[in-house]
Amino acid sequence: MKETAKTTAKTRKAPKKPVGYQPRFSELDQYLFGQATHYDIFRKMGAHLDKKDGKVGAWFTVWAPHAAEVSVIGEFNGWDAHANVMRKVGEDGVYEVFIPGVTEGMMYKYYIRTPDGRELYKADPYAFASEKRPGTASKVAEIEGYRWGDSEWLTNRKKFDVQKSALSIYEVHPGSWMKHPWSESNPDGFYNYVQFAHSLADYVKKMGYTHVELMGIAEHPFDGSWGYQVTGYYAPTSRYGTPKEFKYLVDYLHKNKIGVILDWVPAHFPKDAHGLADFDGQPLYEYCLLYTSPS
């Protein structure tokens, strides 16, 4: 991802709302989001492929209440911060814009200018996919359309009594559990989600485990953290494949009567410039804690 977006410190006004303009982030969305009860917020925030006025493209929606200006930069507009300035929706600092011509797989970031003139280049907190590290851009991804085959598992899960049924959980980190020999095409040696699904299911059934607990699935920049430095909570890490391939992993395990638990990290995240820390120039996804010296 290019970190040299074409920008200027001069204030640019967001496009005026045309007569009859209906934001995708509706008044109900605004209310639920403001009440912290929007339990399907991932369906509205982030990048979503859609059609508007007969044009195919994508909606982009982000929360940045402390920003002076927000725009979408990406390979579809030459990473130009002038090209797609976002409109503010409501009073809670949510911004959105529809960009025609955007297709699945395109990389993007949010350009955020703070009131004091700082320019930030942030990955999308609600992205479904990310550029493979060391790249830090988000990627437009379509997550609908996968044909699940785990209906039998879901039906039986409703009858499962954790207090009375046998439970044996195998905790596993995909990137270190099993690797291919080194090759130029796969220097990391990682199994992709599909390969991992088959090898893991065979092992778990052989050993008699009922569930697996997957570590390091949410996107993170540093391999050595084992996934404990999250930058994208909604994006299965691109190290091992695509969101649809991750769905295959879950689906295949379920079809083999193996439950899936995700190990995730809500308590902390890294300070990487593209991540969640000081997202719009101030603490947004974290508390602002002021420490004083004991002396």
Each model region followed by its residue ranges:
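Short proline/glycine-enriched turn/loop motifs at strand-loop junctions of beta-rich domains
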Residues: 63-69
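Conserved small/polar residues in nucleotide/adenosyl-binding loops
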Residues: 291-295
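The feature marks proteins involved in alpha-glucan
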Residues: 1-55, 59, 89-171, 176-184, ...
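Aromatic-lined carbohydrate-binding/catalytic grooves of carbohydrate-active enzymes
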Residues: 179-180, 187-191, 203-245, 269, ...
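Hydrophobic faces of well-ordered beta-strands that scaffold small-molecule active sites
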Residues: 170, 212, 260-262
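Conserved, mostly hydrophobic/aromatic
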Residues: 62, 110, 172, 214, ...
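Short, surface-exposed loop motifs enriched in S/T, G, D/E and P with embedded aromatic residues
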Residues: 81-89
